[in-house]
Amino acid sequence: VGSEMCIRDRYNFAKEAGCNKIALGHHYDDVIETILMGMLYGSQIQTMMPKLHSTNFEGMQLIRPMYLIREADIKHWRDYNDLHFIQCACKFTDTCTTCNPDGVTKSKRMETKQLIAKMKEINPYVESNIFKSVENVNLRTIIAYKEDGVKHHFLEHYDEWK
Protein backbone atom coordinates (compact mmCIF):
# COMPACT_ATOMS: atom_id res chain seq x y z
CA VAL A 1 0.00 0.00 0.00
CA GLY A 2 2.83 2.41 0.83
CA SER A 3 4.51 2.28 -2.57
CA GLU A 4 1.14 2.36 -4.40
CA MET A 5 0.27 5.53 -2.49
CA CYS A 6 3.64 7.03 -3.39
CA ILE A 7 3.07 6.25 -7.09
CA ARG A 8 -0.41 7.78 -7.05
CA ASP A 9 0.90 10.89 -5.26
CA ARG A 10 3.66 11.26 -7.84
CA TYR A 11 1.17 11.10 -10.73
CA ASN A 12 -1.25 13.48 -9.03
CA PHE A 13 1.54 15.97 -8.33
CA ALA A 14 2.74 15.78 -11.95
CA LYS A 15 -0.79 16.22 -13.30
CA GLU A 16 -1.49 19.20 -11.02
CA ALA A 17 1.79 20.79 -12.15
CA GLY A 18 0.73 20.39 -15.79
CA CYS A 19 3.38 17.78 -16.58
CA ASN A 20 2.96 14.94 -19.05
CA LYS A 21 6.16 13.09 -18.10
CA ILE A 22 7.56 11.65 -14.90
CA ALA A 23 11.31 11.04 -14.75
CA LEU A 24 12.31 7.93 -12.83
CA GLY A 25 15.74 7.26 -11.36
CA HIS A 26 16.43 3.82 -12.82
CA HIS A 27 19.96 3.42 -14.13
CA TYR A 28 21.94 0.98 -16.28
CA ASP A 29 22.56 -1.47 -13.44
CA ASP A 30 18.81 -1.56 -12.67
CA VAL A 31 18.18 -2.41 -16.32
CA ILE A 32 20.59 -5.35 -16.50
CA GLU A 33 19.44 -6.66 -13.11
CA THR A 34 15.82 -6.50 -14.32
CA ILE A 35 16.66 -8.38 -17.53
CA LEU A 36 18.40 -11.16 -15.61
CA MET A 37 15.72 -11.29 -12.88
CA GLY A 38 13.06 -11.70 -15.55
CA MET A 39 14.90 -14.70 -16.94
CA LEU A 40 15.84 -16.32 -13.64
CA TYR A 41 12.72 -15.64 -11.58
CA GLY A 42 10.01 -14.69 -14.08
CA SER A 43 10.61 -17.17 -16.91
CA GLN A 44 10.60 -14.34 -19.44
CA ILE A 45 12.81 -12.15 -21.55
CA GLN A 46 11.98 -8.50 -21.14
CA THR A 47 13.65 -5.25 -20.25
CA MET A 48 12.94 -1.98 -18.52
CA MET A 49 12.12 0.49 -21.30
CA PRO A 50 13.74 3.96 -21.30
CA LYS A 51 10.42 5.60 -22.26
CA LEU A 52 6.86 4.32 -22.07
CA HIS A 53 3.25 5.43 -21.88
CA SER A 54 1.65 5.00 -18.48
CA THR A 55 -0.96 2.26 -18.48
CA ASN A 56 -2.77 3.59 -15.40
CA PHE A 57 -2.61 7.36 -15.90
CA GLU A 58 -3.93 8.67 -19.22
CA GLY A 59 -1.64 11.07 -21.07
CA MET A 60 1.34 10.48 -18.79
CA GLN A 61 4.70 9.13 -19.96
CA LEU A 62 7.48 7.64 -17.87
CA ILE A 63 11.05 8.43 -18.82
CA ARG A 64 14.30 7.10 -17.44
CA PRO A 65 16.96 9.73 -18.20
CA MET A 66 19.69 7.81 -16.32
CA TYR A 67 19.08 4.62 -18.31
CA LEU A 68 22.69 4.44 -19.59
CA ILE A 69 24.41 5.77 -16.45
CA ARG A 70 26.17 3.27 -14.18
CA GLU A 71 25.16 3.07 -10.52
CA ALA A 72 28.79 3.48 -9.42
CA ASP A 73 29.04 6.75 -11.39
CA ILE A 74 25.88 8.07 -9.73
CA LYS A 75 27.21 7.16 -6.28
CA HIS A 76 30.59 8.73 -7.08
CA TRP A 77 28.84 11.94 -8.18
CA ARG A 78 26.68 11.85 -5.02
CA ASP A 79 29.72 11.46 -2.78
CA TYR A 80 31.79 14.05 -4.67
CA ASN A 81 29.00 16.57 -4.17
CA ASP A 82 28.38 15.50 -0.56
CA LEU A 83 24.74 14.68 -1.29
CA HIS A 84 22.48 12.31 0.58
CA PHE A 85 19.62 10.49 -1.11
CA ILE A 86 16.29 10.17 0.63
CA GLN A 87 15.10 6.73 1.66
CA CYS A 88 13.06 5.17 -1.12
CA ALA A 89 11.29 1.95 -2.02
CA CYS A 90 13.93 0.97 -4.56
CA LYS A 91 16.62 0.78 -1.84
CA PHE A 92 19.08 2.95 -3.82
CA THR A 93 20.49 4.30 -0.59
CA ASP A 94 23.39 2.38 0.90
CA THR A 95 21.72 2.24 4.30
CA CYS A 96 18.13 1.14 4.09
CA THR A 97 15.60 0.38 6.77
CA THR A 98 14.44 -2.76 4.95
CA CYS A 99 17.88 -4.37 5.11
CA ASN A 100 18.79 -6.91 7.75
CA PRO A 101 20.78 -5.64 10.75
CA ASP A 102 23.98 -6.97 9.18
CA GLY A 103 23.35 -4.69 6.18
CA VAL A 104 22.62 -7.56 3.81
CA THR A 105 19.25 -7.55 2.12
CA LYS A 106 17.51 -10.75 1.11
CA SER A 107 15.94 -9.27 -2.02
CA LYS A 108 16.06 -11.02 -5.38
CA ARG A 109 17.52 -7.82 -6.84
CA MET A 110 20.46 -7.92 -4.40
CA GLU A 111 21.01 -11.61 -5.15
CA THR A 112 21.00 -10.79 -8.86
CA LYS A 113 23.42 -7.89 -8.34
CA GLN A 114 25.79 -10.25 -6.51
CA LEU A 115 25.43 -12.89 -9.24
CA ILE A 116 26.34 -10.35 -11.92
CA ALA A 117 29.40 -9.31 -9.89
CA LYS A 118 30.50 -12.96 -9.67
CA MET A 119 29.96 -13.50 -13.41
CA LYS A 120 31.96 -10.32 -14.13
CA GLU A 121 34.98 -11.97 -12.47
CA ILE A 122 34.87 -14.59 -15.25
CA ASN A 123 33.69 -12.36 -18.10
CA PRO A 124 34.36 -8.61 -17.86
CA TYR A 125 31.78 -7.98 -20.61
CA VAL A 126 28.88 -9.71 -18.86
CA GLU A 127 27.04 -6.49 -18.01
CA SER A 128 27.09 -5.09 -21.53
CA ASN A 129 26.26 -8.54 -22.92
CA ILE A 130 23.17 -8.76 -20.71
CA PHE A 131 22.13 -5.26 -21.80
CA LYS A 132 22.69 -5.99 -25.50
CA SER A 133 20.89 -9.34 -25.29
CA VAL A 134 17.51 -7.59 -25.42
CA GLU A 135 18.62 -5.49 -28.40
CA ASN A 136 19.79 -8.50 -30.39
CA VAL A 137 16.69 -10.70 -30.23
CA ASN A 138 16.17 -12.75 -33.38
CA LEU A 139 12.50 -13.80 -33.40
CA ARG A 140 13.34 -16.66 -35.76
CA THR A 141 15.31 -18.30 -32.96
CA ILE A 142 12.66 -17.84 -30.26
CA ILE A 143 10.20 -20.68 -29.50
CA ALA A 144 7.41 -18.24 -28.66
CA TYR A 145 6.86 -14.56 -27.95
CA LYS A 146 4.06 -12.31 -26.76
CA GLU A 147 2.82 -9.27 -28.63
CA ASP A 148 0.04 -7.13 -27.16
CA GLY A 149 -0.77 -9.94 -24.73
CA VAL A 150 -1.14 -12.55 -27.48
CA LYS A 151 1.26 -15.48 -27.48
CA HIS A 152 2.75 -16.43 -30.86
CA HIS A 153 4.54 -19.73 -31.50
CA PHE A 154 7.38 -20.19 -33.99
CA LEU A 155 5.28 -22.70 -35.96
CA GLU A 156 2.96 -19.84 -37.00
CA HIS A 157 5.77 -18.52 -39.21
CA TYR A 158 7.71 -21.72 -39.81
CA ASP A 159 6.93 -22.02 -43.53
CA GLU A 160 7.46 -18.27 -44.13
CA TRP A 161 10.93 -18.33 -42.54
CA LYS A 162 12.58 -20.82 -44.90
Model-derived segments and spans:
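Glycine-rich phosphate-binding loop signature in dinucleotide/nucleotide-binding domains
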Residues: 12-20
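Catalytic subdomain that performs nucleotidyl-dependent activation
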Residues: 29-111, 115
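Short, small-residue-biased leader/transition segments that mark boundaries at the very start
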Residues: 1-7
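The feature marks non-catalytic terminal segments
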Residues: 83-162
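Aromatic/hydrophobic pocket-lining residues that form π-stacking "cages" and hydrophobic walls in ligand
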Residues: 9-10, 74
